[in-house]
């Protein structure tokens, strides 16, 4: 497989046709997150947005197909345990952040109710690791920050503003 593939149909724009032959995979960032995932001052929380996109990628199911027929036989999770395991160091490395920035972004997502942090003691290659971070995604809250207009449309009473920005308490400021 080379760079150029043939495109069966044409859009009339050669660049669009060429990009249409590329199979992009990975993280997807809905544009609405830049409006719904924000700091208290109203600025988009870019670090939290990128980390959330990665978390959602891991929670999206992958297709399981029969090798011979190619038929879809089921869906599987992409990670081993009941929840996604990630470390702050992994997230920092992936997104070019400091560990402190990654930690703050994850805490912001938890404060918004989009994820829940779970800390466990685990054993890896015979070594005990305390406080291993597992991330539980909260689908209902993810839906609310991704489709806020649908939440407002479906309410019978006047829509209430969904608290989406992160308010840091003085204790949280001391923790960071």
Region spans (language model):
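Short recognition helix of helix-turn-helix/winged-helix DNA-binding domains
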Residues: 1-93, 97, 107
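Winged-helix/helix-turn-helix nucleic-acid-interaction surface
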Residues: 89, 99-157
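Charged low-complexity intrinsically disordered patches
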Residues: 2-21, 137-176
């Amino acid at each position: 497989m080379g760079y150029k593939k043939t495109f069966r149909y044409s859009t009339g724009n050669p660049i669009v046709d060429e990009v249409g032959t590329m199979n992009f995979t990975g993280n997807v960032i809905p544009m609405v997150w830049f409006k719904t995932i924000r700091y208290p001052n109203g600025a988009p929380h870019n670090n939290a947005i990128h980390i959330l996109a990665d978390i959602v990628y891991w929670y999206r199911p992958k297709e399981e197909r029969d090798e011979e027929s190619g038929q879809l036989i089921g869906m599987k999770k992409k990670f081993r345990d009941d929840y996604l395991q990630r470390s702050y160091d992994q997230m920092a490395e992936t997104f070019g952040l400091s560990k402190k920035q990654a930690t703050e972004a994850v805490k912001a997502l938890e404060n918004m109710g989009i994820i829940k942090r779970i800390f466990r003691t685990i054993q890896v290659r015979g070594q005990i690791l305390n406080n291993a971070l597992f991330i539980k995604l909260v689908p209902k809250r993810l839906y609310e920050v991704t489709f806020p207009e649908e939440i407002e449309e479906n309410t019978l009473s006047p829509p209430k503003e969904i608290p989406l920005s992160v308010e840091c308490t003085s204790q949280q400021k001391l923790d960071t």
